Amino acid sequence: MTYSCPCPENNESEILYQAHHNSHEIKVNVECTSHSNENIKHWKPTLLKCKKCKLIFSSLVNIDFEDSYINVIDETYISQIPFKTKTLKLLFKKIRQHLNKNSEVLEIGSYYGVLGNIIKPHVKIYTGLELSKHAAKYSIERYNLNVIVQSLDKFLKNGYKYDVIIMTDVIEHLDDPFNILKLIEKSLKSNGVLILSTFNIASVIPRIMKRKYYWLIPMHKYYFSNSTLKYFLYKYNLHLFKVKTDTRLISIKYLLNKFIVFAPKLAFAFNYLLNFNFVNNLTVRVNLLDLNIYFS
């Protein structure tokens, strides 16, 4: 059986990792913080690799998740906002030099407004774009942010141009990232900057873990490497000029819940640790060099 790459050239692709279950068994949870005690096999779709452009993508790439995002209510994320704020402040420090009081900024996938709330005081105009009605409402009411609920494709055709467009942990979810990159380029001012973050599938950790890599889940459709992302950015006149690693501050409670999913045989130990209240206030700094921030 042959597979076509979803890139514009539709090159022939081959199976990189074969799923060990039927496609109808896959359970897709599009919440940012999705985790549960489901069998981990449900989190591992078949991965394919283009023979020409080397793009790695999921067998679920043709499934439209947009309607699911609209109805997302992510209570786990809300409970983790104090920790998410610490992480996104680290991100802000790394992108700060590209923002100023005259900047008009668009954040694609603004979710519950944590990054927008950090950015807003430092720029002229901040606009968030979000599919989740619940997340957008929360952002508006809690942080008084300008957040629009609209499809990305439709919004980027309005002709407005920005100094900076930010897209953190979003590109891997998009139905058609190639068309979106094309529209983003047209939505940037002449000296505008696109800042996006995603995981680098060619980095050491995913190479070692292979199909057990923790970010290999159904809600992620595309798995870019530094080289494939650079290739597609260049294709749409978005020239990559800088890459920084992305450090995360994660609560121990959230991390233990993740471990329960990925190592169910040790769930008893992780659940025991969760019984201690002090665990809820602890954080750990994580940088395994597989998450990057790209500037173009």
Predicted features and spans:
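S-adenosyl-L-methionine-dependent methyltransferase catalytic module, highlighting the catalytic core
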Residues: 41, 167, 175-183, 193-296
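Conserved N-terminal segment of class I S-adenosyl-L-methionine
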Residues: 1-168, 178-181, 245-246, 278-295
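Basic phosphate/pyrophosphate-binding loop/patch that engages nucleotide-derived ligands
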Residues: 186
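Surface-exposed loop/turn positions
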Residues: 103, 191-193
